[in-house]
């Protein structure tokens, strides 16, 4: 059971690294601003519609940036895998860290949804400025990474990783990511 818990922790770290990579790619084109602009992108039905600069940049990422929609989908899917994997990690006996990671991942997800300025528009949560949502998203994501690394180091101190163990955890992470 200890080795399974360690394997799940390693898989969570690999998912987290992929979340960081896709998030970094998305951050190059994202504009965390609540300023109202007219849409000028490639999607014809929305051309000229007034929207926040953040939502405009999300549409640009989805339609105009090469691989942008794929990166958004991967980022979202990996975040879901991270949350589900954390639940499994908790069931395997890592309660203290798993609950913290799950809570921080929830805060990061809420910050991500808030910074996109699409789902929360018109709700009481839309009163929070978009840069605050984006900052919350980034801070919570960094905190998740710190907790995962601390937990992984403590597990590895008890049971050192082997090359086969790392290969197995990388392979299982790839299978989960590519599963339809």
What are these regions (language model features)?
Residues 1-180:
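Membrane-embedded alpha-helical bundles that constitute the cytochrome b-like, heme-associated redox core
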């Amino acid at each position: 059971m200890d080795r399974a818990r360690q394997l799940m922790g390693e898989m969570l770290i690999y998912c987290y690294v992929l979340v960081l990579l896709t998030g970094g790619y998305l951050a190059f084109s994202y504009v965390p601003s609540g300023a109202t602009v007219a849409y000028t992108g490639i999607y014809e039905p929305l051309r000229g519609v007034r929207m926040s600069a953040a939502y405009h940049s999300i549409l640009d990422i989805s339609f105009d940036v090469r691989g942008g929609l794929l990166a958004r989908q991967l980022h979202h899917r990996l975040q879901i895998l991270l949350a589900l994997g954390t639940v499994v990690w908790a069931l395997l006996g890592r309660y203290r860290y798993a609950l913290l990671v799950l809570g921080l991942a929830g805060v990061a997800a809420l910050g991500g949804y808030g910074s996109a300025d699409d789902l929360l528009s018109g709700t009481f949560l839309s009163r929070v400025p978009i840069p605050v949502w984006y900052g919350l998203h980034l801070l919570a994501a960094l905190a998740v990474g710190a907790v995962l690394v601390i937990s992984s180091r403590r597990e590895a101190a008890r049971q050192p990783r082997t090359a086969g163990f790392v290969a197995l955890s990388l392979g299982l992470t790839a299978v989960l990511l590519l599963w339809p």
